[in-house]
Regions:
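Multi-pass membrane catalytic core of lipid/isoprenoid biosynthesis enzymes
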Residues: 86-126, 218-262, 301-302
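Extended hydrophobic alpha-helices typical of membrane-associated regions
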Residues: 254-323
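Acidic (Asp/Glu-rich) catalytic motifs at the cytosolic membrane interface
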Residues: 65-89, 200-222
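Intramembrane alpha-helical segments
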Residues: 92-179
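Topogenic membrane-insertion module of multi-pass membrane proteins
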Residues: 1-54, 58, 62, 152, ...
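Functional transmembrane core segments of multi-pass inner-membrane proteins
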Residues: 160-210, 214-216, 232-235
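Membrane-embedded alpha-helical segments that form the functional core of polytopic membrane enzymes
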Residues: 26-28, 44-73, 132-143, 182-204
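Small-residue-rich segments of transmembrane alpha-helices in multi-pass membrane proteins
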Residues: 23-29, 158-172, 194, 223-224, ...
Length: 323
């Protein structure tokens, strides 16, 4: 029995398992910034550039708080729309189960939104006034994803943007030292790859909920694909969203080895993610329907976190072994 508005209730409402997906883009940006700092040529006795620690910590905290904020918003508005009824296939939600009252959840949304803004505001010091607009966009994403865009097949684009391009590129930019603040093509490619990998989580979620979403008038990308080309198209999308980022990152690593003479010693680590992703795909294909797909959701979340760790290790070991 979970007491209403208890610490345990808030812990479950925060959905701690989703925090790994929020951390992965920041982790990848840190690895890229570390590599670029270490491989920069210095003039004379100039000190080797180092990534900035304070904005690094702020970016990670901001990502986690905004993820929790998004979870609270999703919990509240799905409950208000009546989406979390007895037909729901996904994990239990706090408002629907009565763990947290509507008033308390609205307060929680306000608190996490303000906390996220407070954490993100100092990043203006390191990234300029543009960081304010980035923060506004992130807050808008938290609300518009659940209330509007997810109903019109835009969820996957938003995931690519706000779990890939925005967090990777912005984190990289603000943690680089003065005089080196720029976003190169490699950072952008890594950001796109990250967004695609994280989108596998949304694909599984929407594949599980496809029938309920269709009845509710929620036209997700998965619903549109299945209605036009059948269920195999959704399964193939899941497979591609895992494999395309591997091709991107392995291509980058090989390019660096040729151009920058970095090590490819850790490159085989990508095979670990490839095997895990394919295994999860087969599991998804076999289960196909119902609440059992929640197991696939858990496996996919694990795969995303493993992907982030592998990318971090391959990038860091690439320049560390070269040095």
């Amino acid at each position: 029995m979970i007491a209403t508005n208890s610490i345990k209730a808030w812990f479950l409402a925060a959905r701690p398992k989703t925090l790994s997906a929020a951390a992965v883009p920041v982790l990848i940006a840190i690895a890229l910034a570390m590599r670029d700092c270490y491989l920069m040529e210095t003039v004379g006795d100039a000190a080797q550039p180092r990534i900035l620690r304070i904005p690094t910590l702020l970016c990670l905290l901001f990502a986690w708080v905004m993820q929790i904020d998004s979870n609270f918003v999703n919990d509240y508005f799905d409950f208000k729309r009546g989406n979390d009824d007895e037909t729901r296939l996904g994990p239990k939600r706090a408002c629907a189960e009565g763990w947290i009252t509507e008033h308390a959840m609205k307060t929680g949304i306000i608190v996490t939104t303000l906390l996220g803004c407070a954490i993100g505001l100092p990043l203006v010091i390191y990234g300029g006034i543009a960081m304010i607009w980035v923060g506004v966009a992130c807050v808008a994403f938290c609300f518009l994803y659940t209330t509007t865009f997810s109903y019109h097949g835009m969820g996957d684009i938003l995931v690519l943007l706000f779990f890939g391009i925005v967090p990777v590129c912005c984190t990289y930019y603000v943690i680089m030292p003065e005089g080196y603040k720029t976003v190169n093509a490699e950072v952008m490619m890594a950001a796109i790859a990250c967004g695609l990998v994280v989108d596998t989580l949304l694909v599984v979620n929407n594949f599980r909920d496809r029938d309920n979403d269709r009845e509710a008038g929620k036209r997700t990308l998965i619903v549109k694909l299945i209605d036009r080309w059948g269920e195999k198209s959704a399964l193939r999308l899941y497979l591609l969203l895992g494999y395309v980022p591997l091709a991107i990152m392995m291509g980058m690593e090989i390019h660096d080895a040729v151009v920058r003479d970095t090590s490819t010693f850790a490159l085989p680590l990508y095979a670990v993610y490839a095997v895990m992703h394919h295994t999860t795909y087969r599991q998804m294909k076999t289960i196909n329907h119902g609440r059992e797909l929640n197991r696939v959701l858990g496996s996919t979340a694990r795969n995303i976190f493993i992907y982030g760790q592998i990318v971090f290790l391959t990038i860091v070991l690439g320049f560390a072994l070269e040095i």
